[in-house]
A protein has these predicted regions:
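Eukaryotic chromatin- and chromosome-associated nuclear factors
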Residues: 1-123
């Protein structure tokens, strides 16, 4: 079986904590290895500004970049991803506000933050 990703392709790589996906980070494919591994270079940095190192990942932790959602209305309890710090973080909508804003609760940290709907996408 061929790897469905090719050199130079833009992808998203899952960030795992305790074997659970907490975020998807943008990267591009540097090289394919064997039948199911990729060398990836992240397009985001650590919070201190240092670059994330290239990494070999299994394709089961990779997905194509999702298209930007437009004009989506969210409801309470919708499972979504919120864009912050260069990556897409998993969570749920806990409140909907006027002016296209929602309160987003991070699945990983449990913190609630008010977010513009432009920075949210369905999961």
């Amino acid at each position: 079986m061929a790897v469905p990703y090719t050199k130079g392709m833009t992808i998203e790589v899952s960030k795992l904590v305790d074997n659970s996906v907490v975020a998807w980070l943008p990267a591009f494919v540097v090289k394919t290895f064997w039948k199911s591994n990729l060398l990836v270079d992240y397009t985001v940095s650590n919070s201190d500004g240092t670059a994330l190192p290239e990494e070999i990942v299994d394709v089961k932790h990779v997905r194509p970049c999702l298209p930007q959602a437009s004009a989506i209305s969210f409801c309470i309890n919708d499972e979504v991803e919120a864009f912050q710090g260069g990556g897409w973080w998993l969570g749920v909508i806990t409140d909907v506000h006027p002016e296209l804003k929602c309160t987003f609760k991070s699945a990983h940290l449990g913190v609630e933050v008010q977010w513009s709907q432009k920075l949210l996408r369905p999961r």
